[in-house]
Structures are given as C-alpha cells and as structure tokens.
C-alpha cells in the first residue's frame, strides 16, 4: 500500500524559490492598482502623526547603493510606524537646482551656457532634473519604497521656491542677511563660490617654501639687516601678502648663520636648519608681542609688510611666523580687520592673476606658483623648497582643488542665532548619540554662511539695487512681490521680467525715493534650497495636507551634519526659533569587504539595479536591515550571496508554515491555550519573546537586531528544534486530531506574527506569502495590518526554564546520535534506541517525561537508567548510549517498534499508524 497518500504532507502554492526579479514587479503593480499608500493613510487617519521628512537626493543619474541604504532605512521606519499605531505619511522629494545638474546638463545635452540665454539654459537644466526625478522615482518604487509618489516635492516647484523666498525674507528682516567682502572657498573650474558643505578633502602635492622678508624697521629689537622667515605651501598667495603674524606668547630667536641673520620661533630653529641646510647659533631672544610694529619689505613687490599678533599661530610646522594675506584666508581676514590691513585678492573667477598681481597678471595659479618661486630663488629670498603631500580642500562636484578668494558675496550671519541653535541641538534626539557633539561643534565653530553663487540654475537672491543711490533693497513689499510672482510662474520669472515689472506699481527706493532698479544676478546656495524644505513642504497643507511641522525624524548620511541638518537648523532657528526636527538619525557610508570605499577604479562598486535584476529588491532590503547602519556598511557580491542565503532560510520557514496549514481553519480548529501540548506552549512563548524583542528593536531603529532575532528564530528555534520535532505529529496523526490541531494553532500564530514583523523589511515576500495565508477576513495587503501584540500569559517563565533543560538534554543526545551516524551504527535518527543514564534530580526529570523523549530526540525508543554519572566541566551529568532500534520499521512513520506487524490488515505498520489507518478507512470519502 502507498502510505504516502495517508500522510498529511505539506501542501502550498507558495514556491520554494523566491524568483523575486519576476515576482516583485507583479506585486508592485498590485500595490499601485489598489492605491496602497492612500489605503494605509485612510486606515491610520486620526492616529498620532509621525513625520519622517525626506532629505532630497539630487535628481542626477541613476540610483546607487547609497540611495538604497537611505531610502530603505526610511521605508522600514515608515512601514513600521504605520503598523505601530501612527499615521506616518511619507512624501519623497528631490533637490533639483545647483552645480551638479548644471554640469550634467552641459555634458549630456552638449550645451555651452555662455552661448545661450539664461532662460534657455535654465529650461535645459529643468528638463534634465525632471527627467532624473522621474527615473529615480521608478527606481525607488522598484525597491518597494511606499510613499506619495504621485505628489512628491521638487525644489524647483513654484510653491516651493515661493516659500524659500519667504524664508530668505524673514531672515533678512531679522538682520541675518548681509553683503560683504570676505575670503570664501572658490572653485576656479566651476567659477563660483562654495559653502563648507560643498568641500571635500583630498590629498594634494604642493610646494613647501621658506621665504625671507628683509627688516626695514626693527624697533630697536631686530637688526635692520636681518630677515623674518615665513613658510607657505601657496606661493601664489604671496602677491596678496600685507603682513606677517606672530604669536604674542611664543619666544622668537635671532639666529646668526653663514648666510645672514634670521628670525624664527625658538621651538622651530632645528627644523629651520634642517630644511634650509644652514648652520648657526641663537644670538638673541624676544617674545612675540615685542615684535609688534617691526616692519619688513615684501620680497618682490614695493610694499611694506608689518608684524601683527595672532593667537592661531602654532609651532606644529614652518617657522612660527605666518604669511598673512587677508584676501586669501579666513583667519588672515579677521587679523586684517583687527589691524586695518588692505584686502588684496588679485585672482579672478577663473583662477587667473589680475593686474593687481603685477608681472604675474594673466597667469593661472599653478603657473604663478612656479614663476614666483623661480623669482624668489633668483633674488636669493627663497631659503628652501621641497614638495609635500597634504589634505587640501577640493570642489565636491568637479573634484579640483579650490582656492580662498576674497569677493563680495551674500552671507547669512550665524552669530545672530548661534546660541539659540546650540540650545536647540541639546533638545534634539541624536541617533547615534555622537551626532550631537559633532553638529554642536560645527555650529559652535562655523563662520558665516556664504549663500550666494555665481551661477544660473537656482533660486535667485531676491534683492534689488536702486540705480540712483546704488543701495540694496530688501523690504516686506519687495519680498512679497517676488514670492507671489514665483508662486504663479516659478523662479524663471526673475530672468523673464525687468526689476520694475516685478516690483509693485509705484514702488520707490526706501533710501532715496528712486524709481529705477536692477536685480541681483547671483543665485542661492543649494543648501539654502534644501535647508528651506521644512517650511516649503511641512508648512504648506494646501499641497501636502498629511504633513505637519516640525518633523519627528530626519534621516541621512553622517556627512549631513555639516550639510542638510545644519542648513535646515539654521533657517528654522533663524525664522522660527526652534529646530525643524525632534530626532536625527545618521547612517554610515558604504565600503567593500576589505573596508575600502566604493570606487570605479577599484572595481568594487555594486550596482543596485543589477542586483534587483539578478536577486530581487527584497535581498537589498534584507541587506540594509542586516547591517548596523551606525558605522560604515560593507557591501559586495559575496555579502549579497550570504544575504540571499539568510533570505532562503526565512522563506523556507514561511513555506513550511504555509504548507502545514492547508487544511486549517483558525476559527474552527483553534485549540485553546490550556489544551495545547507543552512543546506548542513553549513555541508560543518563544514567539512572544521574539515579538517583544523585535518591536522594541524597531522602535529603537535597531534593524540589525530585528534581522538577527528573526533569522535566529527561524533557523534555530523553529527549523532546528520546533518544526523538526513536530513534523511527525503533523504528518502522521489523524488530520483533525487535537495533537495535530495543537501544533497547527501555534503554526498559524507564528506565521501571522512573522509576516507582520517582517513586512517593513521583506515587503514583497510578506505580501506574496500573505496571499497564501489561510486567514478569514483578510485585508487587501499585509501592510494594512498592525504589529502583533505581546500576550503576557504566553510568557511562561517556568515553562521556558523547563524547556531550556529539555533542550540541554536534547543537545547532548544529538551529539551522541551524530557519532553513531559517523560510526555507521545508524543512518537516520529514527534507526536509534537511546538509553539515558542519570541519577538524582536529573533522573527524576527524565522519568517524568519518559513518553516525550522519542518525539523530542526524533528516535524510535528511549529508556532511562538510574546510574551515578558525573558531569565534567559543568556539563550535564548525563550519559547517552545509542543502539540500533528494536523491532521492525513502520512503513508509514518510519519508527521502529517490536509491535510492527500485529495488525493483520496493515501488517507493516506500528499500532499507532494502524489505528490512524483504520480511522481513515472508516471515514466517508
């Protein structure tokens, strides 16, 4: 007889293989068809709000793994919150202005921005930005990210730009916006000023030179045939030198050498000798403050260079005397203000010397470096020259070195609201906690924010100039006129209309009454664009009615402490007096298995679009959940293979659960808790411990804890223990026996909870499995369910402690069975008869459960003997003996029994199976 047909073997259409690349798009189409985002919003209406405000990625190119990490983290949080009692809308956004998009538009569309009108150029940039916002939108959706994709925000939207103008106006009204001549980071390639957040540091090779300045007024301290020696790595800034700075507290030495007398810091004399190959002795010493007022002559320009005092001078390198050019450095500029020094910056927007540099006019900076050092060598003023490699600021877009250049720019004065910003930082929850110190120090130490850019693709600085008196005009009236116009026509209107057409009829200059005006030509820094998003998106309910201010959470990479978190904090504190976020979470960056950064040259870049095609989006989502995002995250094809293996184990567990519920109706067949078998109650306790741990981890944003807890539950508690033990009961017992229904009751609870717990991570797989789940009154999507709740009555500590001991016994038996298998004594564990030898409490414990052990060990027979056994090294005092099982093998359940063959109708079965077969035979078909 074919007994296979009499067993309750698993039945499910849920496939073993995920085949995610083919299956996921069909699920996506289903979500779109039912308008899942709106359904979730309707379900959660009236619940407390949780607003995760999306930091806008650049609408520039296809998505990369950094995007995946960021967007999936956000999606997991939003999905969890919407299943944990919150109304958690998610409005995605894009940053659409600025240099990156200008450069790509120029390159991809083959245009020259200097040969077409600003409006034409802006139209091309808009076309490029909108195209990539559309492309990225589809790519983010393909990742399973749920959001209001039909109503996202783009920083180029007219209503967004209008709100940004209002923010600028509020800051100006409070006196935080000013125009000033200051040294700013300047990219000669991109021809624009840059903010600190647009700077990257990279290694650069620079000349390292020692230059002498002849003393012309020694103040009775320094002989007038002596020289002061400076050290610099930027010879090109020497034409702008107007002073030499010394530290007031340092001791300086007059050193007599074979080539003249030189003044350097006493602590750097030896270093000076080594660099210049000079020898000599110290003949005099003086404090830095005594040198104030000493005057030197510039080595190649007819100009004096006096000594000034500055606390930032160090003894780390050089000579302790600092070449000071207020037009080329922030500290130099502050010193220049203190001593009323001229601000010279004889370098134009392309990094070419102007007439102010004398004979070097027309040269590029690098050529100037060479020419200046050659001239210094010819005049004998170059004492030493070498080359060094050092960390130097580079432009974030074109990757070229930047310069400091004094130009007239628009600034936001941080001093006006710095103290309030620091107070607000203290109120925000920073995740990880070190983020607080990082942004606190940045805000405490940062200079004023340069907000003007000499480009075209962006929001204009809404300032007018009076043609009569030349003064800047920024009033409530002018700001409102610009904001109202932009709300209707967008910022293109600034280039479309003359100043007089933008300003209200009859507008007059508030300074002189003039009636003719011109517009500012600079645009705003893109960090001002995205930094205004808290107001432009969260405070415009007519466009995004689900949102509110402030946000509960901002979540970006840790580089945004000086970027978006900082600019958002600045605009919010300046205009509203408080931070725009209650909590800020940061993640690390991507590295390969060896800890190296992703780069095309190393060939270690993982393309997410390729991974989705080959493995599926759920594998990427699981990778994000499995890694601890608080530090740098490793990604490689090998790591993704390991992730896919982890996925397979979770999927197999889900499939087993589904397969064994094919004939189960929870309403009809559910066994009350009190009547569940002990092992089933243990599994339920394990499940509810898991629920408690996972929900807590989600609330703490510890997704790697979620993954490892669920993975461990599936592979250890379930596959290796519980599911293995109950297979016999599920397959062999009568289909509707209470023993089998007891197991099924718990399998149903486990599956129901697992699908909910995994939905924020494995969005596609849980949706697919939910379709196969035999529940009554199912929702349209698993995402419309809530998180499972912990049932305290299932957390039976006494039961769990008992089972810890049972599993300790089982572990020792499994080891013995494995040895017996290796020795060819048995094949399958059911071939075994196990003898347990113990005494005392353990013997009593074993005897109490004598009928349970064969099921627990998955063996045919177990007997227990009372013998003294000592447990070595804290081991269980238990001896396990494995022998070949007694009797014949039952052809239905494969257990051995001396009673096989007693039933004449089913002579090759054990009494248990014979009883089941008789019962089945007597049932109507």
From Swiss-Prot:
Which gene name does the record give? Answer: ileS
Q: What does this protein do?
A: Catalyzes the attachment of isoleucine to tRNA(Ile). As IleRS can inadvertently accommodate and process structurally similar amino acids such as valine, to avoid such errors it has two additional distinct tRNA(Ile)-dependent editing activities. One activity is designated as 'pretransfer' editing and involves the hydrolysis of activated Val-AMP. The other activity is designated 'posttransfer' editing and involves deacylation of mischarged Val-tRNA(Ile).
Q: Where does ATP bind?
A: 600
Copy out the cofactor comment.
Answer: Binds 1 zinc ion per subunit.
What UniProt notes about the protein's domains is:
IleRS has two distinct active sites: one for aminoacylation and one for editing. The misactivated valine is translocated from the active site to the editing site, which sterically excludes the correctly activated isoleucine. The single editing site contains two valyl binding pockets, one specific for each substrate (Val-AMP or Val-tRNA(Ile)).
Localization annotation: Cytoplasm
Q: GO MF terms on file? A: aminoacyl-tRNA deacylase activity; ATP binding; isoleucine-tRNA ligase activity; tRNA binding; zinc ion binding
Any signal peptide, and if so, which residues?
A: none
Q: What class of enzyme is it?
A: ligase
**What name does the UniProt record give this protein?**
Isoleucine--tRNA ligase
Keywords of this protein's UniProt record, alphabetized? Aminoacyl-tRNA synthetase, ATP-binding, Cytoplasm, Ligase, Metal-binding, Nucleotide-binding, Protein biosynthesis, Zinc
Q: Name one GO biological process term.
A: isoleucyl-tRNA aminoacylation
CC per GO annotation: cytosol
What start-end ranges are recorded for coiled-coil regions in this protein? Answer: none
